[in-house]
Amino acid sequence: MKKEPILSVKDLSVSFQMYDNGLEKYDLKVISNLTLDVRPGEIVAIAGSSGSGKSLLAHAVMGLLPENASISGEISYKGKVLSQKEKEALRGKEMALVPQSVSYLDPLMKVGTQVRGRKADKEIIKAQREIFRRFHLDEKTEQ
């Protein structure tokens, strides 16, 4: 028996309001009618060429689209359709976006230090380490 999806995207379409050279307004459709379910314990890879909408999908799920974006469809988390406000409340607590480029991290610095900042108090360090443990990032990230 299949588990219920933890994340469900149904008929997601994303477009941007743009202007051409003559300042005529038009909609640039970037994602059209995408449906996706992610169940607990699954690992899902979104693959595609540069500019195909992978990051845009993640931004839509996280509620991080710019002002000129238009979105339709449903994004549900744990069975509940999410509003923009609910996406913002979950962001950084139950949902996070890992950037596609690991070059954002300095390979000569400890990862933990980069994530939390150099002058972190004990509570911040403890919270960061707990999050790393949750995602199976061991102590080597601190070395």
Regions found by a protein language model. Name each.
Residues 101, 107-121:
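Q-loop/switch helix immediately C-terminal to the Walker
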Residues 47-49:
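The feature captures the beta-strand-to-loop junction immediately N-terminal to the Walker
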Residues 62-65:
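Helix-to-loop junction immediately C-terminal to a conserved catalytic motif
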Residues 8, 35-37:
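ABC ATPase nucleotide-binding domain
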Residues 70-81:
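Conserved ABC transporter NBD signature motif
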Residues 81-96:
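ABC ATPase NBD coupling module
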Residues 125-141:
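Conserved ABC ATPase "signature" region
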